[in-house]
Amino acid sequence: MFYSLIINDLYINAVYRIIFGVASKKMCIFAQTKTKIQTINGLFMELKGTKTEANLKAAFAGESQAHTKYLYYASKAKKEGYVQIGNLFEETAKNEKEHAKIWFKYLHGGEIPSTEVNLTDAADGENFEWTDMYAEFAATAREEGFADIAFLFEKVGAIEKTHEERYRKLLGNVKEGVVFSRDEDMIWECSNCGHIVVGKKAPELCPVCKHPKSYFMLRADNY
């Protein structure tokens, strides 16, 4: 794995704030989570605040960046007729993704947090992106004469705002227990086989493909 980008302090700060839970100048639940880990000899040690914690964050950020970058490289290689090279880029990207997962789990007590926690973190991260990060990036780009880049920073920031709104809505559904049930009849669709059910709740099991309730979602006819 290699890193070809020159990463300055502003970029590193932005990445850390997005990934590790500092949003809108306030610490979210990830940053407050205790990160005690069990060592090979059975001792529990506090990871938070150590150099190793900082190294784990840097490793996660680097592996995540490499994963995304290698997927771009794979696509380009295949377009240029190098299918084997493209496949190897994709294989390596999968490796980097798994490396990133190892470090991410160490930073969160050894496991991926719950969906409710993840939705909160994701919403806070998107909020930081559109309220702070992209606004600051756009202002800097415009001051330096890069109007086209400033425009894109602003437009992507606007997209991140809709991402935050979506995560907040989904978080509310999880907290209120209405992901798979509503007060009125709704159209539920199995995302595996397409079976349709009308009612206040999604069935515990799809009667057609036997997939569990978790595969059902509210049908959205927007075409």
Residue ranges and their predicted role:
Residues 6, 10-19, 29-30, 36-41:
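Short, positively charged and aromatic/hydrophobic N-terminal segments
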Residues 31-32, 211:
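Intrinsic-disorder/low-complexity coil detector
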Residues 44-223:
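Non-heme di-metal
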